[in-house]
Amino acid sequence: AYTAQVRSGYGFSSPALPVGTYLDTLSGGEPAPVKGLSIGIPLGLLNRHALVAGATGTGKTRTLQLLAEGLSAAGVPVFLADVKGDLTGLAEAGASNDKIASRIASTGQDWKGQSFPIELFNLGGSDSGAGISGTPIRTTVTEFGPILLSRVLGLNDTQASALQLVFHWADSQGLALLDLKDLRAVVDYLTNTEAGKEELKTIGGVSAATAGVILREIAALEAAGGEAFFGEPALDVRDLMRVSPDGRGIISALELADIQSQGTLFSTFLM
């Protein structure tokens, strides 16, 4: 009776991502797969939040890998953070062995090793710490904007307002702020030159103390890796939403194996 309930509960009419098989443990014998009864998640529900939890070695990373593989096979692009540096194995087809064969037999699943289309990214060209290179993820200061940048720099309301004035002036002059050097140069011009001070008066002044704080925080962000993160070419989110020629979703993996030394840079990226 319970098996029938499970079969009814997982009888989706819409496409679903398979995650396993149902093992019958109620008959009193050894757990055995029920023929024709697979467990899956409807693709339409996979944009919701989920938590994969478990003790060390219970398969959390492997579960995420299987989800990424299933989505890719269904033609859905995937973006994931590879904190431990072990998800790059998606690019290579797995080889069978006795342990895998035994597991397949016990769960009643069909399995064949296959590779998946994967592209590796890192933050601003930083070293992943695992000898893995990838395409740098960057953005320009202009696209990042003064509000988010103020948060990253830890500015108070007065300092944040001053930074917005700097962005406004640069925009009115048609100046693209590509990296932190550009921003520092504009702040320095507006606050430390007579010509710049005169122009700044037309939109509101910035005190020398406020400018000094902004410049110091910019220098600190540069030292923490921001110099590599801000620049061109800027990330286009559409690059993460692509499919391969065979119709499978491309898996974009952000390599973060060295995240412990990239805390400021990673928090900036999350903004």
Regions found by a protein language model. Give the residues of each.
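P-loop NTPase motor domains
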Residues: E69-G70, G75-P77, G85-M271
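Basic- and hydrophobic-enriched, low-structure N-terminal and domain-boundary segments
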Residues: A1-A55, R62-A74, V78-F79, K84-S106, ...
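Residues that cap or initiate secondary-structure elements
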Residues: L45-N47, T58, S126-D127, Q260
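Alpha-helix N-cap/helix-initiation motif
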Residues: A53-L64, I259-S267
